[in-house]
């Protein structure tokens, strides 16, 4: 678990109350009970190297030992989990933009924009039990809205 006092843990849910969970090294959206697993507790820490007005955050899983990152692929930007400790990102141990998401509120939900690719947002898949993705979007949609439930 992340030992920094400002770390907050959340269960992040998608529009229809499906939660984020991990399986086979991927961050998926689905019903953890039906899929026989547990919702992932996501550790969130701020990226102090970017303007606070945009609410830059890191998303860590497995106690903060792995982080969600944006990578360039032939098809465009994509998401992957990397073995990078969230505390090291917070302390500024390396270039961290690709691990950073700008958190903006949309009513009671939040949208997460990739700092490395402006205009690209974390989105839920069209089908359950599929990985979270990035999508280019100008207007908010249900697929890019996530709900944060604090977890202890």
Curated annotation (Swiss-Prot):
Gene3D superfamilies: 2.80.10.50. One of its GO terms (biological process) is cytokine-mediated signaling pathway. InterPro entries: IL-1_fam, IL-1RA/IL-36, IL1/FGF. Expressed in fetal skin, spleen and tonsil. Expressed mostly in the basal epithelia of skin and in proliferating B-cells of the tonsil. The keyword Cytoplasm applies. GO terms for cellular component: cytoplasm; extracellular region; extracellular space. It comes from the Eukaryota. One of its GO terms (molecular function) is cytokine activity. SUPFAM superfamilies: Cytokine. It is found in: Cytoplasm; Secreted. Cytokine with immunomodulatory activity. Alone, does not induce cytokine production, but reduces IL22 and IL17A production by T-cells in response to heat-killed Candida albicans. Reduces IL36G-induced production of IL8 by peripheral blood mononuclear cells. Increases IL6 production by dendritic cells stimulated by bacterial lipopolysaccharides (LPS). Ligand for IL-36R/IL1RL2. Interacts with cargo receptor TMED10; the interaction mediates the translocation from the cytoplasm into the ERGIC (endoplasmic reticulum-Golgi intermediate compartment) and thereby secretion. This is Interleukin-1 family member 10. It comes from Homo sapiens. The gene is IL1F10.
